[in-house]
């Protein structure tokens, strides 16, 4: 037998059971094309034990009924015919725990609907659950009973399908429809949309590499950052788009490596170029000494990626003129011709003096040889 869960389009008024049955078929067959699903209940004409009742429901419909709220209980109580043996429902004790067999979820305290003094587990064999319908006392309530007893099977046909929530959420049957409880990171009536995060950009002086398994800069997207030579990363090197639409970490920045600032030497000057920032990676400084001073050290130094200069700052030292400088190669260019001239004049004077001495000596010898 089949009887309907009321559809939103059903008209008010008294209907015969046949009309209700026809209305149910039309509602559940046509409305899904317009986004509405009906949830119908079914029950067996004959009684059977709990195991066979579940087989009957799964073979012909979806499963034994899973009661979700009081409104459903009220509707079942109002609509189902009285059956002296009552109806099996989809709850069973598994490992001493009452469990919804359709979802394999534990029955919570909030969802319990036991009759007075139930469950009592008489003879320690009452592991299945029936629902009282049109009973004088505790009607609509549950009772634990032995699974071998024979009762009518109370089944349902669900509108939820594996693809109902795009496999990104839990489909929950509701009156005239179903509702999707989306998994983290998804949203929408059928969980068809993915949570988005703000797009990221590569930092200056660096690069960014991202993977987007579900869409650009969306849930589960991951981005990794790297800095170029001569700069260092400030912040986290990796970040991920979370289910809330926020990144796990803020975008990092790449800061250029700094070297110690330099100053011009005493008695000299310094000229520097700074392509990236003052006294930072690739900065270059050139030193010059004033007149009468000598440069001690390298004339040029460059800031390296390690944060150190290629050579220490030079100094300017006053020049000391001496002949020893000639040997060292440090002398004034005018010194050589002057020295040559002095040497030449000195040699010439010596030759003239020597010639005069020889001439005087010759004359003296002649006088001694001639007495008269």
Curated annotation (Swiss-Prot):
Modification note: N-glycosylated.
Disulfide bonding pattern of the chain: 57-155, 128-147, 128-160, 160-171, 165-180, 182-191, 197-241, 227-254, 259-303, 289-316
Alphabetized UniProt keyword annotations: Calcium, Cell adhesion, Cell membrane, Disulfide bond, EGF-like domain, Glycoprotein, Lectin, Membrane, Metal-binding, Repeat, Signal, Sushi, Transmembrane, Transmembrane helix
Pro-piece positions: 29-38
Coiled-coil spans in chain: none
Domain of life: Eukaryota
GO cellular component: cell surface; external side of plasma membrane; extracellular space; plasma membrane
GO MF terms held by the record: calcium ion binding; cell adhesion molecule binding; glycolipid binding; oligosaccharide binding; protease binding; sialic acid binding
One biological process term in Gene Ontology: cellular response to interleukin-8
Domain EGF-like: 156-192
Signal peptide bounds: 1-28
Chain positions carrying an annotated carbohydrate: 60, 104, 177, 226, 246, 278
Transmembrane parts of this sequence: 333-355
All ranges on the Cytoplasmic side of the membrane: 356-372
Subcellular location as annotated: Cell membrane
Membrane topology recorded in Swiss-Prot or TrEMBL: Single-pass type I membrane protein
UniProt cross-references to SUPFAM superfamilies, sorted A to Z: C-type lectin-like (SSF56436), Complement control module/SCR domain (SSF57535), EGF/Laminin (SSF57196)
Subunit structure: Interaction with SELPLG/PSGL1 and PODXL2 is required for promoting recruitment and rolling of leukocytes. This interaction is dependent on the sialyl Lewis X glycan modification of SELPLG and PODXL2, and tyrosine sulfation modifications of SELPLG. Sulfation on 'Tyr-51' of SELPLG is important for L-selectin binding.
Function (record text): Calcium-dependent lectin that mediates cell adhesion by binding to glycoproteins on neighboring cells. Mediates the adherence of lymphocytes to endothelial cells of high endothelial venules in peripheral lymph nodes. Promotes initial tethering and rolling of leukocytes in endothelia.
Family indicated by similarity: Belongs to the selectin/LECAM family.
Protein's name according to its UniProt entry: L-selectin
The organism of origin for this protein: Rattus norvegicus (Rat)
